[in-house]
Design a protein with these regions (language model features):
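N-terminal alpha-helical transmembrane segments of multi-pass membrane transport
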Residues: 1-79, 83, 94-100, 232, ...
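Transmembrane helix-loop junctions in multi-pass membrane proteins
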Residues: 3-4, 34-39, 84-89, 164-175, ...
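Select transmembrane alpha-helical segments in multipass membrane proteins
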Residues: 21-27, 67-76, 147-161, 191-192, ...
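Membrane-interface loop-to-helix entry segments
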Residues: 23-30, 34-47, 172-178, 185-246, ...
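Helix-loop-helix module between adjacent transmembrane segments
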Residues: 30-32, 107-132, 138-201, 357-367
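Flexible loop linkers connecting adjacent transmembrane helices
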Residues: 38-67, 91-98, 113-146, 330-346, ...
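Alpha-helical membrane segments and immediately flanking helix-loop junctions
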Residues: 58-93, 121-139, 143, 157, ...
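Extracellular/periplasmic helix-exit of transmembrane alpha-helices
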Residues: 116-126, 228-244, 252, 256-259, ...
Length: 454
């Protein structure tokens, strides 16, 4: 097992070397500039449109699509807001220092524009099944936009692998927390997860959308409130934590055994990878649900990507990072999963249990979203008949994740995420002029934009 872990770690270091980090940031910068800094210039409009207006029309499912914009956003957030927001942030801080948080913010800022572009493309390129239902995902804009059917199949297979790796992460997080805090056997956690996820799998997209619409807003608000309470009780430590975030991002002081520029690179790598794992910008996962949404213009759905990254990383991940920072627990030898939860308990013991409850909901809703993406990818690559026969295999991966070593689980997930990103980035690079044209059309059309500026 040690030799396997060493081999995978070597692959992971190469895959997530500076080249991929720079490509991701560079592409995010490209989409930010070519779309007129959409995440800044139109932020107020985007929040109103995606949160206020879409919530009011959350049950309006008239038009060309399968689910409403609000439900599509909740399904996507169900897949985004998970262990990465809690344990992923703790892992980044433990490995890259508090400076990793700064790079997480940088990745999120440019990731807003990148995710916006992915969703716009998912609305432009969609397919239909034999019954006329809309099909969406990165496979379609790669197949039709790049005229590369073979690459569409490749990313579908890689996406299946990525979702399986993500399943291991969420299952491992849940089992690790329950085992450490409540002595629940890891195998029992795995069995319970299989049963719960199986119930969702049997219900399909409609059931997933309804569950996500109910759970995601509640659990996100709940976690934010608990986190803010911890921060307020340690308010005097906040300025020092903010200072550490910015100074350690460029500090030459050794962190986690590193020296010089290596430390900065380490903080950058962990901040960007963990931030990306959480908000999924550039990964190609957002197009699955958003491509099925009912809208009048592709950009109307695209702007939800800005909101998702903001809520997921700038709000929820930042709260986790600051809580870990103000309590000082990141300097301990605890595992990331335990560290994140214990940081809440240092202020008031019951808060640890509340944070545990929130984390369990985060991870389970993420498992639901990942199953949906895996099923869509598998269907594209192997056909609906094969998918119907194997769709119940995904829940059984929970037992493997529950029993596997956490460091190995994150390494596997990093590799899978890096592999699936590459073909998606190729498509985003080639197709960015189409996104730019759609953006100009949307924000210059009074039908879509002018009436909402008032």
């Amino acid at each position: 097992m040690e030799s396997l872990e060493l081999f995978l770690t070597t692959i992971n270091k190469w895959l997530w070397g500076r080249w991929l980090v720079y490509v991701l940031l560079g592409l995010g910068i490209l989409y930010t500039f070519t779309n007129g800094f959409i995440q800044v210039r139109h932020f107020k409009f985007i929040v109103k449109k995606t949160l206020v207006d879409s919530f009011k029309a959350r049950n309006d499912e008239k038009g060309s699509g399968s689910i409403s914009t609000f439900k599509a956003m909740m399904v996507t957030l169900a897949g985004n807001v998970g262990g990465g927001n809690v344990v992923g942030v703790a892992t980044a801080v433990a490995a890259g220092g508090m400076g990793a948080v700064f790079w997480m913010w940088v990745a999120a800022f440019f990731g807003m524009a990148l995710k916006y572009g992915e969703i716009v493309l998912s609305q432009l390129y969609r397919g239909k099944d034999s019954e006329g239902n809309l099909l969406s995902g990165p496979m379609y804009y790669i197949r039709d936009g790049l005229k590369a059917p073979w690459l569409g199949v490749v990313i579908a297979v890689l996406m299946c692998t990525k979702m399986m790796g993500a399943n291991l992460v969420q299952s491992n997080t849940i089992s690790g927390v329950l085992s450490s805090n409540y002595n629940v056997p890891t195998w029992l956690t795995g069995v319970i997860l299989i049963c719960c996820l199986m119930a969702v799998v049997m219900g399909g997209l409609k059931r997933l959308a309804n569950i996500a619409t109910s759970l995601v807003p509640i659990m996100s608000i709940f976690y934010v409130v608990v986190g803010l309470l911890v921060i307020l009780l340690n308010i005097q430590q906040v300025p020092e934590v903010i200072k550490e975030i910015f100074t350690q991002a460029f500090s030459m002081k050794a962190v986690a055994g590193g020296t010089g520029g290596y430390v900065i690179a380490r903080a950058m790598q962990y901040g960007i990878t963990r931030g990306m794992y959480s908000n999924e910008a550039g990964e190609g996962t957002a197009p699955f649900a958003h491509g099925s949404a009912i809208v009048d213009h592709p950009c109307e759905e695209g702007i939800t990507g800005v909101t998702e990254v903001f809520l997921d990383t700038i709000i929820i991940c930042s709260i986790t990072a600051i809580v870990i920072g103000v309590t000082g627990i990141y300097q301990s030898d605890l595992s990331p999963a335990v560290m994140a939860i214990e940081s809440f308990g240092t202020v008031w013991a019951p808060l640890k249990h509340l944070a545990t409850f929130a984390l369990l909901l985060f991870c389970f809703t993420t498992l639901m979203g990942q199953w949906f993406n895996a099923a869509k990818s598998f269907t594209y690559a192997f056909g609906p008949k094969v998918t119907d026969k194997v769709r119940f295999v995904f829940p059984f991966l929970c037992i493997i994740g529950a029993l596997t070593k956490i460091s190995l689980v994150w390494t596997i997930q990093d590799i899978a995420m890096g592999l699936v990103i590459i073909p998606n980035l190729i498509a985003l690079i080639i197709l960015f002029p189409q996104v730019r044209q759609q953006t100009k059309d949307y924000f210059s059309n009074p039908k879509f934009y002018a009436q909402d500026k008032k």
